[in-house]
Amino acid sequence: MSDHFRAFSFVDRILSDKQGESIVGQYRIPDSVKEFPVALVAESIGQCAAMSSMAALNFKHRPVAGIASVVEFCGHALPGDVLKLEATLTRADKEAVAYSGVAWVDDKPVAKLLNCLGPMVLMEDFDNPETVRQRYQLLDDSGAPPDAFGGVESVNFESVEKGDGEREGQFTVPHQAAFFGDHFPRRPVFPGTLLMDLKLKFIADLIVNLEGGPWAVVGMHDVKLRSFMPPGEVLELFGKVDKVEGEKASILVQSRRGKRRNSSARVMLAKKSL
């Protein structure tokens, strides 16, 4: 069975779509998965916005991950939950899509994306335009069959503590993974939101050992992805405590390919209530 629209697709119904302007969709998290990280909730919002922008451009272009000014982690999504996805687009043209969005579970926000910008690429370079059009029509009509997603393969990294609130590590993009069949069929690329989730795990020890805690991750600011990550690519990971100010703190985390930075973000922390 093909992994397309199964291994990394997180919109299974479009409830309404004013193409290129606003969209409301939903996604039911399968009961069978062990977890559904908040990074994948953010992915769901982005995919919902992408559907509206692709339809507005007659499926000749599609967006890829670029910049998110603010990602807020407001809650948790569990297996069996139904995500309601909302996105408002302020731009959808051949150059880029700009949008903000939110995911809800039972009228409670789980994640918010603010001021996101995704560059557009030619659809035919990454996927079959007609196949994506048919997928959109299915979502807009009866919706896709639920429970197609079976979880994401574990992705490992090597990490060493550098001292003084710093950490270094290395990560190799898998050579093979089911999600490459969905992201994307014609040009496999490691998803930016999986890198986001990896970064949060990478700096987990920095958060635990940070003075003034215990701390909770409440979001990420200035999230930037500068280049594609093909199968087998080796990335260096770097994390460093940025600021500790009262009940708030932040950690800078980035990845590099050689001497060139390929992604960066500021992880925002808030002191946990005891």
Label every model-predicted segment:
Residues 99-100:
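Short beta-alpha junctions and helix-cap segments that line functional grooves
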Residues 1-36, 60, 77, 90-96, ...:
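Non-catalytic linker/capping segments at the edges of enzyme domains
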Residues 45, 195-200:
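Acidic helix/loop or adjacent segment enriched in Glu/Asp that either coordinates divalent metal
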Residues 181-183, 195, 209:
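Long, positively charged binding patches that form subdomain-scale interaction surfaces
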Residues 85, 103-104:
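Soluble ligand-binding/transfer domains with enclosed cavities or grooves
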Residues 33, 37-51, 185-188:
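Compact, glycine-rich, soluble single-domain proteins
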Residues 49-86, 111-112, 117-118, 200-238, ...:
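Hydrophobic beta-strand-centered segment that forms part of the acyl-chain substrate-binding groove
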